[in-house]
Amino acid sequence: MDVKLIEQAIKGNQDACVLLLQHHQDVLYRIAYSYLRNEPDTLDAIQEMTIRCLTRIHTLKEPTYFKTWLIRILLNVCADLNRKKQRTLPVLQEKGYEEEVHIDLYRALDELEVEQRELIYLKYFEDYQNKQIAEQLQLPEGTVKSRLHTILKKMRKRLGGV
């Protein structure tokens, strides 16, 4: 994304900020939906993230970290919504005759804690490298690797070694 546009947004240009949000809207929607698993909560999270972005963009110190900063805001909003509702995420609704393996995989993903699902999502759905995940989540890279290993081991056990 254009650093100059980000700098304009930091200086208070709301049109620039809106353009930046529009540029990232697809990935932000996918991330929110992967956590919240329903459309209304996803839209609420996106709306709250947008408000926080517009009111706090002036606090962004490094324009090159805009996307990371934005995703972190969204992850915090999603965590807030989950805590507020104090509920577990429902299993994805099956549509038609999906293969049993896919259904089992969705169930295994749903059984993970939000933080674990976040790691899996960033690694396998967004194709982030371990180093990028570590930066995004503010964790040591070794911690990311070990947590991913543990999560995958747990999922393999749940899926019966698939």
List each language-model region with its residue ranges:
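N-terminal module of bacterial RNA polymerase sigma factors
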Residues: 1-26, 110, 157-162
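A short pre-motif secondary-structure segment
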Residues: 119-123
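C-terminal flanking helix
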Residues: 25, 29, 50, 113, ...
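Internal acidic/polar
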Residues: 2, 80, 85-110, 129
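Short, charged helix-capping/linker segments at alpha-helix termini
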Residues: 10-19, 29-48, 136, 141, ...
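Arg/Lys-rich amphipathic alpha helix in sigma70-family domain 2
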Residues: 55-62, 72-91
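DNA-recognition helix of helix-turn-helix
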Residues: 79, 131, 137-162
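Structural recognition of an alpha-helix C-terminal capping motif at a helix-to-coil junction
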Residues: 30, 44-51, 55, 64-76
